[in-house]
Amino acid sequence: YLQGAEGAFLNIAKLFCREGKEKQANSVNIIGATPLDFSVNTSVSSIKKWLLDNGFSVQSCFAMDSSLDEISTAPQAAVSLVISSDGIASAKYLFDTYGVPYVVGVPVGKSFSKKLSADLKRAVSEGVCINSCGEKAVENAHMIVAGESVFASSLGAELGAKTVATVGIRNSEVLSGTDIFCEEEAELEKLFSQHKTVIADPLFSPICKGARFISLPHVAFSGRCFLKDIPDLIDKDVSKILNL
């Protein structure tokens, strides 16, 4: 699904975005917001609130809660925030074509959200692109987070954990040197067995033996089976919510 969303976002940017008015100071494009990654809970609204609380405004949101008219103004943004791997191609297009820098990461947790805010401000002031979720120190090597690459890497950065991207666009820009892109169940089972704590969608629990399993549902994996159990981790105490 990510490849399809990536192509859709990129073509929307190419077809509808036009340079016009001046850049809007501290305005942000949110790119990569899909119901499969951010479900129907409050995460996207929380990202918007977090941006406002940190001195930013929302220019557009690709593609939840924004009209095509709003998305067409994306070149006027000061920076783009890429919250899933399917948004990277369109963010690069906006940077190459209109000079809008981008930052990659989801503001999960308290510590990582502060870093992400600082990186957004740096991107605006210096005009540079930053992979925030790929810049992390693995302090809890016994813990591994599985999921969509940008979200899982962001959560891994908050927790100091390793990341295994089990769904996503194979992109070295997102994953850090300690992260892994994995598509095979047997390989995943082996990886999980090498760690004490595994954070993943509940449908992965049958192949997680001998480790503490922390359920973090993801609609792209388990559909609507666990919708009510999907937490909003934006700018919150992740360890408390996940009972780590």
Feature names for model-found ranges:
Residues 1-244:
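An N-terminal assembly and electron-transfer interface module characteristic of large anaerobic redox
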